[in-house]
From Swiss-Prot:
This is Flotillin-like protein 1. One of its GO terms (cellular component) is plasma membrane raft. It comes from the Eukaryota. The lineage of its organism: Eukaryota, Viridiplantae, Streptophyta, Embryophyta, Tracheophyta. Residues 228-320 form a coiled coil.
Amino acid sequence: MGFAYRIASASEYLAITGYGIADVKLAKKAWVAPGQRCTRFDISPVNYTFEVQAMSAEKLPFILPAVFTIGPRADDDDCLLRYAKLISPHDKLSHHVNELVKGVIEGETRVLAASMTMEEIFQGTKSFKQAVFENVQLELNQFGLIIYNANVKQLVDVAGHEYFSYLGQKTQQEAVNQAKVDVAEARMKGEVGAKERDGMTRQNAAKVDAETKVYTVKRQGEGAKEEARVKAEVKVFENEREAEVAEANADLAMKKAGWQRQAMVAEVEAAKAVAIREAELQVEVERTNASRQTEKLKAEHLSKAVVDYEMKVQEANWELYNRQKAAEALLYEQEKQAEARRASADAAFFARQREAEAELYAKQKEAEGLVAMGDAQSAYLSAMLGALGGSYAALRDYLMVSSGVYQEMARINADAIRGLEPKISVWSNGAGAGGEVGEGGGAMKEVAGVYKMLPPLLTTVHEQTGMLPPAWMGTLTGGAPSSTS
């Protein structure tokens, strides 16, 4: 058998297994190669109708009619793959699939109903249906199925257990009783309302009469007040008009006085202007005479001054020229000297630079030598430490001996005590002498020995340090030791 091209319809998928496919391949169209198997499965939802028998927490049975629209989840590849593996080998309308879905729904419904009382189920029907829907969906997820719609009908009594019918009768009777109560309350409200309306009518009539009297008196008072206000406004208007007339007369008098003052000022200004003009003309005449006299004097003395000025200018220019030439020569000489000093400084700088580079090179080589010496010493110490079995104390002693540290310490100590004249005293408490064998033994003998050692000890301390013992301990006389006991 050769290659075959397979195409699925709009509500179908192809499940391909076999050669070259690790698990299951889902596709809408594909080439089927030899060694492969292609299976079609429909993903359209199916309606499942059930009447689930459950029991509440009080052990009361009931029937839950339900219609579930269930199908594979087309927008999730994982769900489709699970459906293709678990459900697609069977017809979706087969008894096997029907029993599977029914078992899931009945199981979740019974578990949920067993945790609730009948009153809770009856009062919270909507929440109960939602809980059934959510729990069933969780179980169907493992088969790749999704609930498209769930229509849970009204709860029904089981034959011989009429709990819901009794609850309905109870509700109906409560509604009838509530209706009677509502009718009685409405009749009571009507009678009470009629009496209240009659009383309110009388109260409103009396209130209107009182308000009418008050309004009449109030309007009369307002009329009197308005009349007095109008009279006052008329009087104020007359006073304002009289004040405006007086103000106009005062303004007219002030304007007349101002006009007279301006006329007098104009006459005075005219007279002063004539006098000022006469003085200005006289000043012009005097200025003209002075200018003519100045020109005459300039003509007499200016020619001589001009000649003297030109001669002095020529002399100043010649002297300036000589000074400029001398300054230029001096500047040229200073520039040459500066160039010579610059060249000398460059040569000295070059020489110092070479010396610095040579010194830097020498320091670098010296540092490299120190580094090499340090590396060699490090290798030497590591080898010695290994030869001595890792004993740092033995390595230290060897290094001190090889470097002459002990010899140097001995030399320093010898230099420190050179020139000193130490006094060495040796004494004995005479415990081994025959003359003292007869003395008391034990503790008293030891105490006697200590007291005998004190005099020579104090004498030696005095000879070497010059210090005397305290008076309570003993005294030294004539260089001979003495003690008190």
